[in-house]
Curated annotation (Swiss-Prot):
Its main location: cytoplasm. Residues 424-460 form a coiled coil. WD repeats lie at residues 13-63, 73-110, 123-160, 164-204, 207-251, 258-296, 302-349. This is Coronin-1A.
Length: 461
C-alpha cells in the first residue's frame, strides 16, 4: 500500500486567534465607500482607519493600546474636503501617515506620540498634481520621504515629501485606464501595477520604462491585484472567465505561463494580498469575506502551497496588516491583521504553536527596521538598496517621535498663504531680528572690553 508523503513545513499549523472584546476598537463608523482599498493601516504605535464623515473626508488614528469603546467625539484627521480612499504609514517614521482622497490631493500628516487631543486639520504637506481622485498611496520601502500616488486620472506620481515636489510622472501613455494596484519591489527599484486594461506591468519608475508586462493574467473582467514576492516573482489575484476567484504566481522573466494557478471559490469580493518576505507566506483577504487564506511560496514546484484558512462569522469591510516589528515574538506571532467590521476593528493574531518560550530564530529572521537605507536624492540618482535589517530577539521598542522635515518654501499646500508660511519674513519678524542683532553686538563689545582689561592685569603682574 502506498503512503502519501505530506510536505514538511513549520507553517502547516499556523492558526488565527481573534482578540477578546476588550482588546478591539468598538463603536467606530467604518467607511461605506466601495473603493477596493484596505481602509486600515497599522504600525507599532498606531492604528488608523477610514471613517464615515459628514462634510468631507476623515480618518481615525488611535494609539495601539487605546482599545475598547471609542468616544463618538474622538478627534480625527479631517483635512480633506472629500472622502479618503487610501492611507499608508511611513515605514521610516511611525508618526507620519499619508492619505489619498476624492478631492484629488495627497496629504501627509504628523501624529504626536499619545495620539490626537484635538482634530487635525492642517497637514505637514499637501501634494497636488492629480486631476481626479487619488485611490492609492504607497511609501518607498527603503528611501527616505519618497511617496507614490496613483489617481483615477491614470497617472502615477512619485513625490519627494521633503520638498513637496512630484519628481517622477508616469502618465496615461503607460496606463490607459484605471490603475487597480501598485506595489514596490523590496529594494524599491521597480513597481508592479495592475490596470483596468487587463494588463499587469513591471515598471522602472525612474526611467519610465516597462520592464515586462502580462496581458490577461486572469481571464475575468473583475479587478486584478498584483504584488512582488520573493526571488523576482509576482503574485496576482483575479477572476476566471466563469467568475471564479483565482490566485497565480509568475516568474517576471517568463510571463507566458504562470508557475502556479489555483481556483478558490465563486465569491465576488476582490482578494487583497499581503506578503511576508520573512516567512514567504502570502495572506489573501477578500472584501466582504469572513475568512483569511494563507499560502506558502517555495522555490520548487508547485511553488504555491495552500496552508490553511482562518474563518469567522462576520464579513470584513477592510483589513490592516502589522509590520513584523510590531508583533509579539514571545507568543510566536508571525502576523497580525486588523479586521474592519461595520462598527469595530478587530485584531487577529496568526500564531505558530511552539512549546518553548524561548526566542524562535527560525520564525524571526532579521526583518526590515525603521531606518531608511537611502535618501530621496540617492534613490533618484540611481542607487538601490534593500531594507536595513534588525533582530527581534530582544523585542522591539518603537523610537520616540521623529520630526518630518519639510522645505515649506516648496510646499504646494493650500495653507501657504501668509508671508511666514510662504517663506518671506514679515516686517515684525525683521524688526525682532534687528533688535536681537543689536543686543548681540553690545554683548560682544562688553566681552571684548573685559578681555582687554584681563590681559592688562596679567601683563602688569
Amino acid at each position: 500500500m502506498s503512503r502519501q508523503v505530506v510536505r514538511s513545513s513549520k507553517f502547516r499549523h499556523v492558526f488565527g486567534q481573534p482578540a477578546k472584546a476588550d482588546q478591539c476598537y468598538e463603536d467606530v463608523r467604518v467607511s461605506q465607500n466601495t473603493w477596493d482599498s484596505g481602509f486600515c493601516a497599522v504600525n507599532p504605535k498606531f492604528v488608523a482607519l477610514i471613517c464615515e464623515a459628514s462634510g468631507g473626508g476623515a480618518f481615525l488614528v488611535l494609539p495601539l493600546g487605546k482599545t475598547g469603546r471609542v468616544d463618538k467625539n474622538v478627534p480625527m484627521v479631517c483635512g480633506h474636503t472629500a472622502p479618503v480612499l487610501d492611507i499608508a504609514w511611513c515605514p521610516h517614521n511611525d508618526n507620519v501617515i499619508a492619505s489619498g482622497s476624492e478631492d484629488c490631493s495627497v496629504m501627509v500628516w504628523e501624529i504626536p506620540d499619545g495620539g490626537l487631543t484635538l482634530p487635525l486639520r492642517e497637514p505637514v504637506v499637501t501634494l497636488e498634481g492629480h486631476t481626479k481622485r487619488v485611490g492609492i498611496v504607497a511609501w518607498h520601502p527603503t528611501a527616505q520621504n519618497v511617496l507614490l500616488s496613483a489617481g483615477c486620472d491614470n497617472v502615477i506620481l512619485v513625490w519627494d515629501v521633503g520638498t513637496g515636489v512630484a519628481v517622477l510622472t508616469l502618465g496615461s501613455d503607460v496606463h490607459p485606464d484605471t490603475i487597480y494596484s501598485v506595489d514596490w519591489s523590496r529594494d524599491g527599484a521597480l513597481i508592479c501595477t495592475s490596470c483596468r486594461d487587463k494588463r499587469v506591468r513591471i515598471i522602472e519608475p525612474r526611467k519610465g520604462t516597462i520592464v515586462a508586462e502580462k496581458d490577461r493574467p486572469h481571464e475575468g473582467t473583475r479587478p486584478v491585484r498584483a504584488v512582488f514576492v520573493s526571488d523576482g516573482k509576482i503574485l496576482t489575484t483575479g477572476f476566471s472567465r466563469m467568475s471564479e476567484r483565482q490566485v497565480a504566481l509568475w516568474d517576471t522573466k517568463h510571463l507566458e505561463e504562470p508557475l502556479s494557478l489555483q481556483e478558490l471559490d465563486t465569491s465576488s469580493g476582490v482578494l487583497l494580498p499581503f506578503f511576508d518576505p520573512d516567512t514567504n507566506i502570502v495572506y489573501l483577504c477578500g472584501k466582504g469575506d469572513s475568512s483569511i487564506r494563507y499560502f506558502e511560496i517555495t522555490s520548487e514546484a508547485p511553488f504555491l502551497h495552500y496552508l490553511s484558512m482562518f474563518s469567522s462569522k462576520e464579513s470584513q469591510r477592510g483589513m490592516g496588516y502589522m509590520p513584523k516589528r510590531g508583533l509579539e515574538v514571545n507568543k510566536c506571532e508571525i502576523a497580525r491583521f486588523y479586521k474592519l467590521h461595520e462598527r469595530k476593528c478587530e485584531p487577529i493574531a496568526m500564531t505558530v504553536p511552539r512549546k518553548s518560550d524561548l526566542f524562535q530564530e527560525d520564525l524571526y529572521p532579521p526583518t526590515a527596521g525603521p531606518d531608511a537605507a537611502l535618501t530621496a536624492e540617492e534613490w533618484l540618482g540611481g542607487r538601490d538598496a534593500g531594507p536595513l535589517l534588525i533582530s527581534l530577539k530582544d523585542g522591539y521598542v518603537p523610537p520616540k517621535s521623529r520630526e518630518l522635515r519639510v522645505n515649506r518654501g516648496l510646499d504646494t499646500g493650500r495653507k501657504r498663504t501668509t508671508p511666514e508660511a510662504s517663506g518671506a519674513p514679515s516686517s515684525d519678524a525683521i524688526s525682532r531680528l534687528e533688535e536681537e542683532m543689536r543686543k548681540l553686538q553690545a554683548t560682544v563689545q562688553e566681552l571684548q572690553k573685559r578681555l582687554d582689561r584681563l590681559e592688562e592685569t596679567v601683563q602688569a603682574k
